[in-house]
């Protein structure tokens, strides 16, 4: 990957691995607020389903402002799962790079996004490019914008584990994106503090809450009727339904095997439980999961759910077991305990608030923590009723107002979460 990325990213990588803070300045980073603009062209770039869930509410909010012209560019790093989300939110891309290939590599994704973004950016010449989180699409789109000397706004900025291989490649992606970005939209105070430690200008950081909470206002309905035959058949009222998702690269192989074996043994021990596991389309994930759980009674392996199906399934479930970052934020907002199937999390606010627990990938630890929730109603209630630290449903508005403020079209800095 680094063969196509000159000194900037390599210098950042070296500084990061040495545990040092690199400070980069450029004309676009030191620009004062624009004062003579009447309209801002804002390009939102995303490519995966989790990004789309969190960016679509922002796109819809951008469309409300007369002095903002929104442009949507998708890379389709995840083709089918991305399209599901776009349809639900009614967002139609202006550009679709359509980069997804079977068994695609990180190098391949990087190359195709960088080349595709060059043409789009040169044609549209946006005033600012918005990227989200920690995907390869986000990092490379930010880099492409930097090469064109276009401002970058980083949505969901400041999350850190400080282990560049966990999660991989997401931790490095978000650190590199953070070094490029001109504006940083941090969900929480802790994320803000992380950026301050990295010498990011405090005036360029906005604490907004997380846009995923905005998304839940659209997707979760009390009277929602499931489209999935499997979900329609489940007795959510009389069974304890556990929603499971696990697909991260660092969990492939033995970690995922241990997760699946833990699920199998939990179901054996608790006959009133049902497990719903929407299995990621990655062949490496599907092969492992189906080989261990494919014939298991009361374990329902289904194709990935669209965002409305998933959010409403979580809202009616007993608890969630996941290695997903977004679900660590979504489930607590729906009052569901979460066991995180990872060794660490870049969302420690949830751990501190008591809405999630780190189960890791050890079979016995996963079983022990699951049994605590299944056996102890007080422990369950404590997690389910803990305050969600991630937002109030106003993150997209705050981001839009911050952009207007930065470009001189709003006189007051927006309120913060």
Give the role of each language-model region.
Residues 75, 79-80, 180-254, 359, ...:
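A nucleotide-sugar donor-handling region in carbohydrate enzymes
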């Amino acid at each position: 990957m680094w063969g196509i990325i000159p000194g900037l990213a390599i210098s950042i990588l070296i500084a990061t691995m040495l545990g040092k803070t690199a400070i980069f300045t450029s004309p676009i980073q030191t620009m004062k607020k624009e004062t003579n603009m009447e309209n801002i062209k804002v390009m939102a770039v995303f490519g995966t389903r989790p990004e789309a869930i969190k960016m679509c509410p922002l796109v819809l909010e951008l469309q409300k402002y007369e002095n903002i012209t929104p442009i949507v560019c998708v890379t389709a790093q995840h083709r089918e799962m991305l399209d599901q989300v776009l349809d639900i939110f009614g967002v139609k891309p202006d550009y679709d790079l359509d980069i997804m290939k079977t068994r695609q590599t990180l190098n391949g994704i990087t190359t195709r996004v960088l080349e595709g973004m060059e043409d789009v950016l040169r044609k549209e010449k946006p005033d600012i490019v918005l990227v989200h989180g920690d995907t390869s699409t986000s990092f490379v789109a930010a880099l492409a914008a930097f090469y064109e000397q276009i401002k970058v706004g980083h949505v969901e900025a400041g999350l850190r584990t400080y282990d560049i291989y966990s999660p991989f490649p997401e931790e490095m992606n978000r650190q590199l994106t953070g070094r490029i970005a001109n504006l940083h939209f941090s969900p929480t105070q802790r994320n803000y503090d992380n950026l301050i430690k990295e010498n990011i200008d405090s005036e360029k950081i906005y604490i907004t809450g997380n846009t995923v909470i905005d998304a839940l206002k659209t997707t979760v309905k009390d009277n929602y009727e499931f489209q999935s035959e499997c979900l329609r058949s489940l007795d959510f009222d009389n069974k304890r339904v556990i929603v499971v998702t696990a697909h991260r690269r660092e969990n492939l192989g033995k970690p995922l095997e241990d997760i699946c074996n833990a699920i199998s043994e939990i179901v054996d021990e608790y006959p009133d439980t049902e497990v719903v596991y929407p299995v990621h389309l990655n062949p490496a994930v599907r092969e492992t999961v189906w080989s261990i759980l494919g014939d298991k009674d009361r374990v329902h392996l289904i194709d990935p759910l669209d965002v409305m199906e998933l959010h409403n399934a979580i809202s009616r479930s007993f608890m969630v077991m996941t290695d997903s970052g977004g679900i660590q934020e979504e489930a607590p907002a729906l009052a569901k305990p979460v066991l995180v199937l990872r060794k660490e999390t870049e969302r420690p606010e949830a751990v501190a608030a008591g809405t999630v627990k780190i189960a890791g990938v050890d079979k016995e630890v996963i079983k022990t923590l699951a049994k605590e929730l299944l056996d102890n109603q007080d422990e369950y209630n404590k997690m389910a009723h803990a305050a969600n630290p991630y937002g109030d449903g106003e993150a997209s508005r705050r981001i839009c107002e911050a952009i207007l403020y930065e470009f001189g079209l709003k006189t007051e800095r927006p309120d913060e979460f």
